[in-house]
């Protein structure tokens, strides 16, 4: 499997977001975990009131967003849940794509142990359905921590590979950004229509 190259990530953020759907995230730690991206949200940087970098806020936390596309940006919500973002666009254009949900592809027991401490077939139906259908959940299941912040998808132990398949993309409002005034209405959340791993339809 070949990693996506830098040029994939340095394009328009909306296009990157839509094109990430169906691609495979690979995390290599003790084992190799593969998850198909089924839901994303685009964040348009300086002019997007929902983005951490809105108004050109360059801080210790957001400085990785100012790198060229293809770097990992991990932040925490509620002081405990990690969220995986893919930096997009050109250098000094602080935009990113939030990975909201993935479908486990390989070594699903490892996903399950990371998330619940037991094998997948020991989980309840509810737990199986909720294993990776949200940004914090997928980070727990794939063991993506703050240590991943700043890693390079083009050379480090987390990367994304191409995957050819056809599906219908749904565009909708982003989730949990009611504070963002007009930006809360942007249709910048994209997901694979028939995926059962999408967080919310």
From Swiss-Prot:
Its EC number is 3.2.2.-. It comes from the Bacteria. GO terms for biological process: base-excision repair. One of its GO terms (molecular function) is alkylbase DNA N-glycosylase activity. Disulfide bonds: none annotated. It is an enzyme of class 3 (hydrolase). SUPFAM superfamilies: FMT C-terminal domain-like. Keywords: DNA damage, DNA repair, Hydrolase. InterPro entries: Formyl_transferase-like_C_sf (IPR011034), MPG (IPR003180), MPG_sf (IPR036995). PANTHER family: DNA-3-METHYLADENINE GLYCOSYLASE. Belongs to the DNA glycosylase MPG family. This is Putative 3-methyladenine DNA glycosylase. It comes from Clostridium novyi (strain NT). The lineage of its organism: Bacteria, Bacillati, Bacillota, Clostridia, Eubacteriales.
């Amino acid at each position: 499997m070949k990693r996506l190259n830098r040029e994939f990530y340095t394009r328009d953020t909306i296009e990157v977001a839509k094109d990430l759907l169906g691609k495979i995230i690979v995390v290599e730690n003790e084992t190799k975990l593969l998850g198909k991206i089924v839901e994303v949200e685009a964040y348009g940087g300086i002019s997007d009131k929902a983005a951490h970098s809105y108004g050109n806020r360059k801080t210790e936390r957001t400085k990785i967003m100012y790198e060229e596309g293809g770097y990992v940006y991990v932040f925490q919500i509620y002081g405990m849940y990690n969220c995986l973002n893919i930096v997009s666009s050109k250098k000094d254009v602080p935009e990113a794509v939030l990975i909201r949900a993935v479908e486990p592809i390989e070594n699903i027991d490892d996903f399950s142990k990371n998330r619940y401490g037991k094998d997948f077939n020991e989980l309840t139906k509810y737990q199986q359905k909720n294993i990776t259908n949200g940004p914090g959940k997928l980070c727990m299941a794939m063991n993506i921590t703050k240590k991943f912040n700043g890693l390079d998808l083009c050379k480090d132990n987390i990367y994304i590979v191409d995957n050819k398949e056809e599906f219908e993309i749904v565009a909708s409002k982003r989730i949990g950004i009611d504070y963002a005034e007009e930006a809360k209405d942007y249709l910048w959340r994209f997901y694979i229509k028939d995926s059962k791993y999408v967080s919310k339809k």
